[in-house]
Amino acid sequence: MRPAGRSNNQVRPVTLTRNYTKHAEGSVLVEFGDTKVLCTASIEEGVPRFLKGQGQGWITAEYGMLPRSTHTRNAREAAKGKQGGRTMEIQRLIARALRAAVDLKALGEFTITLDCDVLQADGGTRTASITGACVALADALNKLVENGKLKTNPMKGMVAAVSVGIVNGEAVCDLEYVEDSAAETDMNVVMTEDGRIIEVQGTAEGEPFTHEELLTLLALARGGIESIVATQKAALAN
């Protein structure tokens, strides 16, 4: 029996609260069960030096965890004087995922920074970050159109992510912390709304997994992401 009695293919309750803060062009509080992440999208005119004069935009991301988002306090990375490898890996993943959602040429020379701050962690913080940041990004792009800075919206479609894994020999979707810490296989999957794969990060923590198990996990992820995308679209429709 999984925590909260979920079936193996069932994601946790997903909530997306838009306009959570007042200053950012897009802001969303995303909740995957007890995992809560604040995602903001900020627009700046101009692009990084390596893109100047090319007539296209850029999307980047930063990720961080509040000191007491976990069971025991972790010092802020600013206090340590440098970002950890995990943080850099996750924020690059978020940026790659969200660049796949946008026509960067149609964006023009704007940079959008997605800030994902974990308020409470109970597994799946990176997948929640991608899911919430996509909605914040959609709101920010809508503002560019509403303000007359873009003629057409460069958003190509929604992007969402979910964790899957093998726990106690069974393939399950959207792992909570207690499952994640005991998983034999742990995988994060990012997809477009039509089921195309953007990224798969998979690791055998114990016993190596088979090709058949990989296909099972990808199918579980697709089903979970379809449900999450429906929640994203419902949030944007309100």
Swiss-Prot record:
It comes from the Bacteria. It catalyses: tRNA(n+1) + phosphate = tRNA(n) + a ribonucleoside 5'-diphosphate. Pfam families: RNase_PH, RNase_PH_C. Homohexameric ring arranged as a trimer of dimers. InterPro entries: ExoRNase_PH_dom1 (IPR001247), ExoRNase_PH_dom2 (IPR015847), ExoRNase_PH_dom2_sf (IPR036345), PNPase/RNase_PH_dom_sf (IPR027408), Ribosomal_Su5_D2-typ_SF (IPR020568), RNase_PH (IPR050080), RNase_PH_bac-type (IPR002381), RNase_PH_CS (IPR018336). Phosphate binds at R86, G124, T125, R126. It is an enzyme of class 2 (transferase). PROSITE patterns: RIBONUCLEASE_PH. The keyword Protein biosynthesis does not apply. One of its GO terms (biological process) is rRNA catabolic process. Belongs to the RNase PH family. Gene3D superfamilies: GHMP Kinase, N-terminal domain. The gene is rph. This is Ribonuclease PH. NCBIfam families: RNasePH. Its EC number is 2.7.7.56. GO terms for molecular function: 3'-5'-RNA exonuclease activity; tRNA binding; tRNA nucleotidyltransferase activity. Phosphorolytic 3'-5' exoribonuclease that plays an important role in tRNA 3'-end maturation. Removes nucleotide residues following the 3'-CCA terminus of tRNAs; can also add nucleotides to the ends of RNA molecules by using nucleoside diphosphates as substrates, but this may not be physiologically important. Probably plays a role in initiation of 16S rRNA degradation (leading to ribosome degradation) during starvation. Keywords: Nucleotidyltransferase, RNA-binding, rRNA processing, Transferase, tRNA processing, tRNA-binding.
